């Protein structure tokens, strides 16, 4: 199943942490494409440093919740703490879309409910998949 995963980091060594996260994703899934890294301003939350963001396209046989567990395990291994909503982080891995799966479950909403509002997701995704369609919306090039 094709999965779209957004990555972000803004404390510690963001580039190194994202490189390690991608390497760990390669161990757990088949990474098909990785965007360039983008420097972006934080959205919401407390005052904090700019983020480094990217998007990966993965191929995975894991069920969506199992893939989410892999992403959260990678975050934990890289020191992710969930103390402050939209606060600074060593790494953030968000499952944006998983095949054509639609989910409103509390533990996993798909597609990601705010992806269509987040330029730091849309621009890197467009770079590696210009014809992508965000389910429940339109082509990402039109957002």
Protein language model features and the residues they cover:
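A general structural signal for well-ordered alpha-helical packing
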Residues: 18, 22, 31, 53, ...
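Extracellular and analogous surface-interaction loops
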Residues: 59
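N-terminal beta1-alpha1 ligand-phosphate binding loop
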Residues: 1-28, 35-41
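Flexible, gly/pro- and Lys/Arg-enriched active-site loops
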Residues: 12, 35, 42-51, 62-143
């Amino acid at each position: 199943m094709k999965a779209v995963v957004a990555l972000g980091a803004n404390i510690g060594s963001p580039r190194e942490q994202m490189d390690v996260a991608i390497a760990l994703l390669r161990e757990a899934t088949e990474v098909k494409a990785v965007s360039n890294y983008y420097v972006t301003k934080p959205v919401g939350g407390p005052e904090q440093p700019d983020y480094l963001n990217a998007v990966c396209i993965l191929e995975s046989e894991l069920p969506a919740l199992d893939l989410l567990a892999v992403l959260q395990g990678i975050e934990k291994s890289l020191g992710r703490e969930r103390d402050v909503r939209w606060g600074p982080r060593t790494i953030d891995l968000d499952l944006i879309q998983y095949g054509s799966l639609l989910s409103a479950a509390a533990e996993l909403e798909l597609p990601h409910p705010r992806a269509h509002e987040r330029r730091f997701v849309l621009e890197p995704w467009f770079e590696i998949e210009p014809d992508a369609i965000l389910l429940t919306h339109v082509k990402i090039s039109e957002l």
